[in-house]
Curated annotation (Swiss-Prot):
PANTHER family: MOLYBDOPTERIN COFACTOR SYNTHESIS PROTEIN A. GO terms for biological process: Mo-molybdopterin cofactor biosynthetic process. Keywords: Lyase, Molybdenum cofactor biosynthesis. It holds the Pfam family MoaC. Catalyzes the conversion of (8S)-3',8-cyclo-7,8-dihydroguanosine 5'-triphosphate to cyclic pyranopterin monophosphate (cPMP). Pathway: Cofactor biosynthesis; molybdopterin biosynthesis. The gene is moaC. This is Cyclic pyranopterin monophosphate synthase.
Length: 164
């Protein structure tokens, strides 16, 4: 029978005890995206959105989300994050639709990984872009959100293969 790590003997939720795990450097990289129309693309690129600088605000939202992951995802450990970075790149190959790729990198030196923090940062970044531009078009599409890579920890390294 499978032993559930987040369920105690009484069948109730619990946070995994990581006291005996080794402290190691851990890094996770996550990806998300949002596809927008040409008007929104131009507003973001030219910094002319009436709500302000969309990318700067979205970066801050992603950083805040990573820092607060344990408050919104049950059983996530609160972690002392040592680095959070949010990068953007446009894919203009399907104009008049434009996809903004979001890559988040989160690091810590600790006893548990930062995959959830990187994924939460990527998600919140995309959601913030949607929120700041929805007055122009509510038809935007938030794309797949996934872990690109992780390093450190007992389970070792992970690198997503293309097509995976």
């Amino acid at each position: 029978m499978t032993e559930f790590t987040h369920i105690n003997q009484q069948g109730h939720a619990k946070m995994v005890d990581v006291s005996d795990k080794q402290i190691t450097k851990r890094t996770a990289v996550a990806h998300s995206s949002i596809t927008v129309n040409e008007t929104i693309y131009k507003q973001i690129s030219n910094n002319t959105n009436t709500k302000g600088n969309v990318l700067n605000t979205a970066q801050i939202a992603g950083i805040m989300a990573a820092k607060n992951t344990s408050t919104i995802i049950p059983m996530c450990h609160p972690l002392p994050l040592t680095g959070i970075d949010v990068h953007f790149s446009w894919d203009e190959t399907n104009a008049p639709l434009y996809t903004l790729n979001i890559q988040t990198t989160v690091s810590t030196t600790g006893k548990t990984g930062v995959e959830m923090e990187a994924l939460t940062a990527a998600s919140a970044t995309a959601l913030t872009i949607y929120d700041m531009t929805k007055a122009v078009d509510k038809g935007m599409i938030i794309g797949e959100t996934y872990l690109e890579s992780k390093s450190g920890g007992k389970s070792g390294d992970f690198q997503r293969q293309s097509g995976q």
